[in-house]
Amino acid sequence: MSNNIPAELKYVASHEWLRLEEDGTITVGITHHAQELLGDIVFVELPEVGANLAAEEQAGVVESVKAASDVYAPIAGEVVAVNDDLPSAPETANSDPYGAGWFFKIKPANPADYDGLLTAEQYAGEVD
């Protein structure tokens, strides 16, 4: 797998990635492909901690010099944390999309839903 699509993560077709944490929460961000399409990110709106989101529900917004795009909840659950550094440094979603550029953490309503998401290989097929 390319470094731009880490093998240990899960993905959805709307270009969000998910990482299952040891405590059972799931960290969510936008993929390298998404940030590349958007260009220089200048604004990020995150969901509220405590929000209960349905899968595929709008969870936030990301705006770049080229476009604005919604960020979706890739899995149903409760938002338990947001990346408070991101709104003041939105370019982090460009420079480190799988690390410091994460968007929010969600406690899944049904943890088994995670297993049905796209693997890195499947996501690579979606973006080729």
Curated annotation (Swiss-Prot):
InterPro entries: 2-oxoA_DH_lipoyl-BS, Biotin_lipoyl, GCV_H, GCV_H/Fam206, GCV_H_sub, Single_hybrid_motif
Cofactor note: Binds 1 lipoyl cofactor covalently.
Gene Ontology BP term (one): glycine decarboxylation via glycine cleavage system
Cofactor(s) in the UniProt record: (R)-lipoate
Keywords attached to this entry: Lipoyl
Gene Ontology CC entries for this record: cytosol; glycine cleavage complex
Domain Lipoyl-binding intervals: 25-107
Superkingdom of source: Bacteria
Residues modified as N6-lipoyllysine: 66
Pfam families, per the entry: GCV_H (PF01597)
SUBUNIT field: The glycine cleavage system is composed of four proteins: P, T, L and H.
UniProt xrefs under HAMAP family: GcvH (MF_00272)
UniProt xrefs under PANTHER family: GLYCINE CLEAVAGE SYSTEM H PROTEIN, GLYCINE CLEAVAGE SYSTEM H PROTEIN-RELATED
Family (UniProt): Belongs to the GcvH family.
Function (record text): The glycine cleavage system catalyzes the degradation of glycine. The H protein shuttles the methylamine group of glycine from the P protein to the T protein.
Stated name of the protein: Glycine cleavage system H protein
Native source organism of the sequence: Neisseria meningitidis serogroup C (strain 053442)
